[in-house]
């Protein structure tokens, strides 16, 4: 075990281009925000270490490009992810409608029992909001995942979103299975690299 941390969790941010994935990452990792929009090319990542229930957890958070032309590149990053945050823009109904497609991507590429979270970003834009909170919550409930509305600009619920993910993953790491049929098979990560890309959809980590 690495003396600097007890767990290393790999998280993935996915969703349409322009929904604010990079801004969420910057807010959580660096506590910064910029109005400038620069589309992510391929993938980017940041690391933040947190203390949760007396355990030091290193979060490696990958920000993926939302554009279709990068799907082949980014799909490989689903494998080995412990948690995936699906982000939509509360002022853009198309981005919410596309959440179902992103969920299908998770089913196709991620391990079967990966932790998921639905996030409606830009909740500070109250006058421009067109995706009802109740509609998004109903969808999240229908697929059995948590839901939060966030604002990378005001930092509302950003910390909570990532802490929810870390907490849920840690439960699985500690052997607490929310679903008895779960095939999640993760252990404390050794600092020797990432999970190799393979055909099996099992969250084993080496």
Curated annotation (Swiss-Prot):
Family matches, as NCBIfam families: small_GTP
What molecular function does GO assign, one term?
GTP binding
Which Pfam families does UniProt cross-reference here? Ras (PF00071)
Keywords (A to Z) from UniProt: Autophagy, Cytoplasm, GTP-binding, Lipoprotein, Membrane, Methylation, Nucleotide-binding, Prenylation
PTM Cysteine methyl ester: list the residues.
203
Tell me what topology the record assigns in the membrane: Lipid-anchor
Q: Tell me what gene encodes this.
A: rab1B
Where it sits in the cell: the answer is: Cytoplasm; Membrane; Preautophagosomal structure membrane
Q: Which GO terms describe its biological process?
A: autophagy; hypotonic response; intracellular protein transport
Q: Where does GTP bind?
A: 15-23, 33-40, 63-67, 121-124, 151-153
* Family per record: Belongs to the small GTPase superfamily. Rab family.
The record places the motif (Effector region) at 37-45
The highest taxon in the source lineage is Eukaryota
User: Lipid biosynthesis as a keyword?
Assistant: no
- What protein name does the entry list? Ras-related protein Rab-1B
Q: What does this protein do?
A: The small GTPases Rab are key regulators of intracellular membrane trafficking, from the formation of transport vesicles to their fusion with membranes. Rabs cycle between an inactive GDP-bound form and an active GTP-bound form that is able to recruit to membranes different set of downstream effectors directly responsible for vesicle formation, movement, tethering and fusion. Rab1B regulates vesicular transport between the endoplasmic reticulum and successive Golgi compartments.
Primary residence:
cytoplasm
Can you give the propeptide residue ranges?
A: 204-206
Q: Name one GO cellular component term.
A: endomembrane system
